[in-house]
Amino acid sequence: MEGSVCVDGAAAPAPDEASLIEGVSNAVLLVLVLSVTLLAGLTTLLCRSEQQRIHPESQERVRVVREQLQAEQVSSESRHQFYSDMSCPVCLQQAVLPVETNCGHLFCGSCIIAYWRYGTWLGAISCPICRQMVTLLFPLFQDSEQSAVAADSPVEPTLILTDISDYNRRFSGQPRSLLDRLRDVPTLLRHAFREMFSVGGLFWMFRVRILLCVCGALAYLVSPLDFLPEGVLGLLGFLDDFFVILLLFIYISIMYREVVTQRLAG
């Protein structure tokens, strides 16, 4: 009788006390939590441009600039609306000569320049929406649109482009934290790839550098030699692949910012 009890006790599997959830290993739980966190962070970065509400700390300054612009400009009925899906949160009208900040928010060219001039010319402004430091302004209007806009608007496109170039020349090279670099990645990547596949956009050396970086990242992803091999660590082995992709995006955004800075300096 005692022998059978011993046999039954030896046959019973020992419970896995190290696992937080029965039947699911801790490695799988860790990868799941990290993946959800990474996806949530990327979704937040990509959707930041959808938020167009003025930050409470910038409301008073925006109100003064809005009143100043309304006093200087003609009535809104005479403003030609080229962009049906883009509005400026400063003047509360359709964006004329639209400009995008490095944090991904859209303003009229004259509005963001007036917002800069109302404060101080000695330092970079903070975005009226997210309060991130604005170190780059991207004009979203083309040369072919300037004459049509100038016919119906008192704003001179050439002066706006000059002010934008002056702003970028002053503040595009300012040091930024790692968090600010991550926040800039979606906007800079979008502009970099847009210029990369356009005629007369980025010069060929920069395009070759991007292609080499992409090829290097792809070679690492398909290579069986990993810092964290999937065959040994399971799902944890994909963490280094996510890290390589993230570094690739950050490096391309840094290269594109350097190209924009050199273009302004030249």
Swiss-Prot record:
Its main location: endoplasmic reticulum. Disruption phenotype: Morpholino knockdown of RNF170 results in developmental defects visible by 48 hpf, including microphthalmia, microcephaly, and loss of motility. Neurogenesis in the cranium is remarkably reduced, specifically in the mid-hindbrain region. SUPFAM superfamilies: RING/U-box (SSF57850). It is a multi-pass membrane protein. SMART domains: RING. It is found in: Endoplasmic reticulum membrane. InterPro entries: DUF1232, RNF170, Znf-RING_euk, Znf_RING, Znf_RING/FYVE/PHD, Znf_RING_CS. Keywords: Endoplasmic reticulum, Membrane, Metal-binding, Transferase, Transmembrane, Transmembrane helix, Ubl conjugation pathway, Zinc, Zinc-finger. CDD domains: RING-HC_RNF170. A zinc finger (RING-type) spans 88-131. This is E3 ubiquitin-protein ligase RNF170. The lineage of its organism: Eukaryota, Metazoa, Chordata, Craniata, Vertebrata. The gene is rnf170.
